[in-house]
């Protein structure tokens, strides 16, 4: 069944929260469901589940024609008229990974795919989970050392995006 949404601040146009608790949302076209203690400042973020996420920035969108339904009810709640119509609106190109927790996404079109990940800068994606071995320049390979110095104990901090079979382009940044 539905869990009531409680203790939320939702401001802006077209923002919705379903079964959410203690979220703060400001912007346009955001849609959160099943989330707890998330902060979203930006536009067109869609996220299902998760908790303790901080999102600052807007997602990339595209214009799409979507079908909606207008429903008129009488005082008793009985449907007396239902009419389908189409409208063109901005929709996000993608949704965030479901059930992500403790993530930080700062910048336009950023995303985190693993719990605890951090994505900083436009189009950055944090996709590497904890447990990944760091690169050892002395061997030109991932380190075999399993200490916390070489093996991550938390998800990655990303300032770019690696190319994957389903994505277009690599994004790199210089850290100075």
Q: Which residue ranges define each predicted feature?
A:
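Glycine- and small/polar-enriched repetitive beta-structure motifs of secreted/surface proteins
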Residues: 1-176
